[in-house]
UniProtKB/Swiss-Prot annotation:
Disulfide bonds: none annotated. The lineage of its organism: Bacteria, Bacillati, Actinomycetota, Actinomycetes, Mycobacteriales. InterPro entries: Cys-tRNA/MSH_ligase, Mycothiol_ligase_MshC, Rossmann-like_a/b/a_fold, tRNA-synt_1_cat_dom. This is L-cysteine:1D-myo-inositol 2-amino-2-deoxy-alpha-D-glucopyranoside ligase. HAMAP family: MshC (MF_01697). Changing W227 to F/H: 100-fold decrease in catalytic turnover.
Length: 412
């Protein structure tokens, strides 16, 4: 599947420090320790509606990771999926009287356009779930053969389920107790009360064919993949074991990332699917989490149509820490536009203060769990000094603009 065009990335003199990130499984900030090639899997969209700022905040966060790895001298293998076969897509297509494939293609293309406009570096592999059916089938076969999965006794719909107790470590990624798991499982696409399951927390691997739904052949009957196993299969076949980062929004901690990890660990025997599980906070509007179901979305495409500079969108989202739940507002956008204007004015000066210290601090702040508020404040200080007092360094305006472009993805 085609992704989107990559923006040019300038090179900042020197090399960035090693990255440290909060790991949701270990509940602490600790070093990320990739080899020469850093690997990252980030869960992609279910394309039944346009890209909102909650999506943008997540993909901008991992764009920072991508950029910082490049700045530190790594090659990056980044994989992202598209969940182009799932219940929300079918429901929206039926509501709108459109074929689900047409809807998925349309919204995926809009997502590509939004990501390109936001100057997000594209993934190395951009994989639709419908292009990974063979990998999913193979993985489900292995899980069935090992006893980690079973087929429910249902003559009409013999679905395949994963045993939540298939791995001794199940639950380590989220750290949630069983009651919390059951609540979130029911709220986020699970089916705890499905008759025939061995345990309420057993998760769907393969949904047997239903009338009006797409299906594919498999040794265990026609059907379609469950949500979690798509990501497990795509990540293992594109990257393999020892994934450096599994990433997504905090609403994916459970059940999605817990089960994706458990599926992969059951197949490979590895203790941990990913070395780091990294999650972004939710973006709200009008006092509530921004979500399609609530209908309070601020769409990237709408902001672009209104003439909002994509660099201002980046700065607005970077004004808060990536792990925090935070709110978007007109005030946030106004502040981002003002900051962008100041930075552009300062970096357009013929001379300015020396930039060595500010570049080092920006690198250090970003490497320390993506502390964008401190990085932005450091740049604000340099720009204020440049505009208020001037300087004598003819290279520093260009170097600061290069740093902002390369590390923050903001075009000055």
């Amino acid at each position: 599947m085609q992704s989107w065009s990559a923006p040019a990335i300038p090179v900042v003199p020197g090399r960035g420090p090693a990255l440290r990130l909060f790991d949701s499984a270990d509940r602490q900030v600790r070093p990320v320790t990739p080899g020469p090639t850093a690997t990252m899997y980030v869960c992609g969209i279910t394309p039944y509606d346009a890209t909102h700022l909650g999506h943008a905040a997540t993909y901008l966060t991992f764009d920072l990771v991508h950029r910082l790895w490049l700045d530190a001298g790594h090659t990056v293998q980044y994989v992202q999926n598209v969940t182009d076969v799932d219940d929300p897509l079918f429901e929206r297509a039926e509501r709108d009287g459109i074929d689900w494939r047409t809807l998925g293609d349309r919204e995926t293309q809009l997502f590509r356009e939004d990501m390109a406009a936001l100057r997000v570096l594209p993934p190395h592999d951009y994989v639709a779930a419908t292009d990974a059916i063979a990998e999913v089938v193979e993985m489900v076969e292995k899980l069935l053969a090992s006893g980690a999965a079973y087929i429910v006794e249902d003559a009409e719909y013999p679905d395949v389920y994963f045993r939540a107790d298939a791995t001794a470590q199940f639950g380590y990624e989220s750290g949630y107790d069983r009651d919390t798991m059951l609540t979130l499982f029911a709220e986020r696409g699970g089916d705890p009360d499905r008759p025939g399951k061995s345990d309420q927390l057993d998760a769907l691997l393969w949904r047997a064919e239903r009338p009006g739904e797409p299906s594919w052949p498999s040794p265990f009957g026609r059907g379609r993949p469950g949500w979690h196993v798509e990501c497990s299969a795509i990540a293992l076949t594109r990257i393999g074991t020892g994934l450096d980062i599994q990433g997504g929004g905090s609403d994916l901690i459970f059940p999605h990332h817990e089960y994706s990890a458990a599926h992969a660990e059951s197949v490979t025997g590895e203790r941990r699917f990913a070395r780091h599980y990294v999650h972004t906070g939710m973006i709200g509007w009008d006092g509530h989490k921004m979500s399609k179901s609530r209908g309070n979305l601020v769409l990237v495409s709408q902001l672009r149509a209104q003439g909002v500079d994509p660099s201002a969108i980046r700065l607005g989202l970077f004004s808060g820490h990536y792990r925090e739940d935070r709110f978007w507002s007109n005030e946030v956008l106004d502040e981002a536009n003002a900051r962008l204007a100041r930075w552009r004015s300062a970096t357009a000066l013929p001379e300015a203060p020396d930039a060595t210290d500010v570049i080092a601090r920006v690198r250090q702040y970003l490497a320390d769990d993506l502390d964008t508020p401190k990085a932005l404040a450091a740049l604000d200080g340099w720009c204020t000094d440049a505009l208020s007092y001037g300087g004598h360094d003819t290279e520093s305006p260009r170097l600061v603009a290069t740093t902002v472009d390369a590390l923050l993805g903001v075009d000055l």
